């Protein structure tokens, strides 16, 4: 019997494809109007190319609702961003004979529009229909004209143009080239600098191919106009940041319809990792939010013009926004993606000297609060993501903490010398309050990584520095019945009751500083204030690494609850503001998760919807959407750790992580469902099956030559130092299977029979037992067994 049960455990599976089509719940219109600023065009998960309309008023994501006119369709966009624009490169505009450019733009009025996952179409007033879908690095167009049509191509177009040279956050044209290669091909490039991160020039190369021959009406270095004899034209636009040759190679053979099907299948695969059940409205909110999380950053592996190291991701907009909610979500449900993102940050460090806090157009910047690559690394390590050089990561983190950068807006830490000398950043240095509090959290993350690497001296140093938030905690300041706040202090250690209002060269009025004061008039941005995008009332509740210490500083649990209640009642909570993401969950720390639930549920109901204005603030690369996802799941991650705050939710929720599974089988004529999951805890893989726990060392995971034989039927059993794998084969055996088509386990040779995109099918020489082993996963898990001589066949489900 024991061996019968143990054979069962070899068959643990990752997610089996669900029958339900989750793509039907994605509505790209959600969050596109108002503050959300999400991208509405077609996109692949983490796709580099995002084709869509650019309206003449140039919103950040290109699109604006009707009746705003369309300047054309460009191939590159961001999603959910505030501040200045970025991208909007290589414009295509279909038109009819007789239409003319006006001030360099051939704007068209829409009379109809369709927005769906992976598909965009619009009908112009002149009855030209444009349909768009995309691959990861190639845009697909199907244009239907009411008569033989024209196409305008403009390599000089981009979003965020400004008449003032070198205006902050505006993009500026550096150069272009357009070349007619053949009667069906146009190639060229556009080089643009600036934008939101004030970055160096980036160059977008394109290779455009049509399925119908064209004649050339006009061509120069910036633009061309083409004429078609046909009324329907299919166009593919390959994009590269390296060369036209690479852009050409990025064009797949698929037709428009085939590519749309491929795109939707890929989204189904990604969305199905989380299974949420609720009302149709909530399903749309949930899966659209999950879709938004996977729009940025973008996978540009092989498309970095500066170095060849891979992987490479770009468009971190910004880690200051995403580290709290998006980073843990990817680490839990998409660990292979998050592993690549962390390694990309380390490749940037190796080649440019610092990990970015933000990056776009292959250029670091702009750093907003802290150096939050530290949080991303600590979060990955806490969640057991392997394949990352954590020694190198610690080196990069320490450089952030010790070496002042040449340009602190681009990378690293501003005010670092003062922070390391005084233990805080004094008033007068921009964002001094934000930086002090967030550097303390970053230092705590450094300490956690150092501890896991066994570097106690480094751990002690940065744990000490993680308490620096207390150096701006003014214990005697009382406001609205609350005592103690993060407040401004000068370099001599004096607390400032009043601060200058603005930066006028001739007039410096002083105003009293209070916890609800924004220390700048309307004409100055958040970059120059004591807190970035927040108030003291908000940041005085934002110490995620030391909430118990914060509660003590506030006067204990009762005073802390009163502070939270007052904070919400007085309207200081800003749902759209990342420093407040954790705040409604803080009731957990005083033993009242029910109050956290009440707050979060109310916030979701009052501020989010499935309508175009359904996001209350900038989505910021999925930060706002991932906050919504966690709220709907009834749990919240503590970034930099593997811990969650949890409460029950009314809607039935099933979370589908790659490492949370359900083993389904028949034993003794009874149908069984046994939960199976695994989590890394340092170098120990903790496997849970039924009520048993198996602690397996990393060396065993990597090199074992057989399965473990401990029973999972023993109630609450804990097996330490397990010598074999449990529910999966070792990485060495999997490597042998890939290289040789066979592996040996427990003295039995298993040979490859066939494979699919998800599994490798193997059969044992000894008794023809069959297994299906998962491909491309964190662990090579056995997903299915058949023809078991013990008479037990089973499948694994999620």
Regions found by a protein language model. Name each.
Residues 7-13, 210, 219, 228, ...:
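Generic detector of low-complexity/intrinsically disordered segments
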Residues 488-489, 773:
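Active-site and channel-lining beta-strand-loop segments
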Residues 1-20:
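Bacterial Sec-dependent N-terminal signal peptides
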Residues 651-798:
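Acidic, serine/threonine-rich low-complexity disordered tracts
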Residues 20-375, 381-437, 445-471, 477-483, ...:
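Accessory carbohydrate-recognition regions in carbohydrate-active enzymes
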């Amino acid at each position: 019997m024991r061996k019968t049960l143990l054979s069962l455990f070899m068959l643990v599976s990752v997610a089996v494809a669900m029958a339900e089509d989750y793509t039907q719940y994605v509505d790209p219109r959600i969050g596109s109007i108002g503050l959300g600023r999400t991208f509405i065009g077609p996109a692949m998960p983490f796709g580099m190319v995002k084709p869509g309309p650019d309206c003449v008023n140039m919103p950040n994501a290109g699109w604006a609702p009707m009746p705003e006119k369309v300047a054309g369709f460009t191939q590159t966009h961001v999603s959910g961003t505030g501040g200045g624009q970025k991208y909007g490169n290589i414009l295509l505009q279909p038109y009819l004979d007789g239409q003319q450019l006006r001030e360099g733009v051939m704007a068209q009025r829409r009379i109809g529009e369709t927005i769906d996952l992976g598909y965009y179409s619009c009908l112009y007033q002149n009855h030209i229909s444009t349909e768009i879908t995309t691959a990861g690095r190639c845009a697909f167009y199907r244009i239907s004209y009411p008569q033989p049509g024209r196409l305008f191509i403009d390599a000089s177009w981009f979003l965020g143009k400004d008449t003032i040279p070198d205006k902050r956050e505006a993009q500026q044209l550096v150069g272009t080239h357009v070349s007619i290669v053949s009667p069906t091909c146009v190639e060229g490039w556009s080089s643009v600098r600036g934008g939101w991160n004030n970055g160096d020039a980036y160059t977008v190369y394109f290779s455009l191919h049509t399925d119908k021959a064209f004649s050339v009406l006009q061509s120069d270095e910036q633009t061309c106009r083409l004429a078609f004899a046909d009324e329907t034209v299919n166009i593919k636009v390959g994009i590269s940041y390296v060369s036209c040759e690479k852009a050409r190679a990025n064009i797949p053979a698929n037709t428009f319809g085939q590519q749309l099907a491929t795109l939707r299948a890929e989204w189904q695969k990604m969305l199905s990792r989380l299974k949420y059940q609720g009302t149709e409205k909530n399903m749309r909110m949930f899966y659209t939010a999950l879709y938004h999380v996977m729009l940025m950053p973008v996978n540009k592996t092989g498309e970095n013009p500066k170095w060849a190291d891979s992987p490479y991701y770009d468009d971190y907009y910004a880690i200051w926004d995403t580290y709290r909610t998006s980073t843990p979500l990817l680490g839990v449900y998409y660990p292979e993606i998050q592993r690549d993102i962390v390694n990309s940050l380390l490749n940037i460090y190796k080649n440019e000297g610092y990990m970015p806090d933000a990056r776009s157009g292959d250029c670091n910047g702009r750093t907003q609060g802290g150096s939050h690559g530290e949080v991303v690394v600590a979060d990955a390590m806490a969640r057991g993501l392997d394949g990352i050089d954590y020694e190198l990561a610690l080196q990069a983190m320490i450089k952030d903490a010790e070496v002042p950068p040449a340009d602190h807006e681009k990378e690293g830490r501003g005010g670092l010398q003062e922070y390391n000398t005084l233990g805080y950043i004094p008033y007068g240095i921009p964002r001094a309050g934000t930086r002090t509090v967030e550097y303390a959290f970053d230092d705590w993350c450094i300490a956690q990584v150092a501890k896991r690497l066994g570097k106690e001296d480094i751990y002690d140093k940065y744990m000490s520095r993680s308490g620096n938030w207390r150096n701006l905690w003014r214990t005697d300041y009382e406001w609205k019945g609350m005592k103690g706040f993060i407040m401004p202090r000068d370099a001599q250690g004096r607390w400032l009751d009043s601060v200058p209002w603005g930066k006028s060269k001739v007039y410096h009025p002083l105003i009293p500083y209070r916890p609800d004061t924004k220390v700048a008039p309307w004409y100055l941005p958040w970059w120059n204030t004591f807190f970035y995008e927040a108030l003291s009332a908000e940041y005085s509740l934002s110490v995620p690494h030391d909430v118990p210490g914060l509660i003590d500083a506030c006067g204990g649990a009762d005073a802390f609850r009163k502070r939270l209640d007052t904070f919400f009642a007085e309207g200081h909570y800003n749902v759209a503001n990342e420093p407040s993401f954790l705040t409604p969950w803080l009731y957990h720390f005083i033993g009242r998760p029910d109050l956290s639930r009440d707050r979060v549920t109310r916030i979701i109901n009052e501020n989010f919807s499935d309508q175009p204005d359904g996001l209350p603030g900038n989505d910021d690369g999925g930060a706002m959407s991932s906050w919504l996802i966690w709220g709907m799941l009834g749990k919240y991650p503590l970034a930099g750790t593997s811990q969650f705050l949890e409460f029950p939710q009314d809607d039935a929720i099933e979370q589908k992580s790659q490492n949370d599974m359900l083993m389904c089988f028949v034993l003794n004529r009874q149908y069984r469902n046994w939960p199976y999951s695994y989590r890394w805890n340092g170098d120990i893989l903790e496997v849970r099956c039924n009520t048993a726990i198996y602690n397996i060392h990393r060396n065993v995971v990597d090199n074992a030559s057989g399965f473990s034989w401990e029973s999972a039927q023993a109630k609450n059993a804990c097996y330490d130092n397990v010598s074999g794998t449990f529910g999966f084969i070792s990485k060495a055996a999997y490597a042998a299977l890939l290289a040789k088509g066979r592996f040996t386990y427990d003295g039995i040779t298993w040979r490859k029979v066939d494979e699919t995109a998800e599994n490798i099918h193997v059969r044992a020489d000894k008794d023809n037992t069959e297994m299906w082993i998962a491909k491309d996963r964190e662990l090579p898990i056995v997903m299915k067994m058949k023809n078991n001589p013990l008479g037990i066949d089973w499948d694994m489900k999620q």
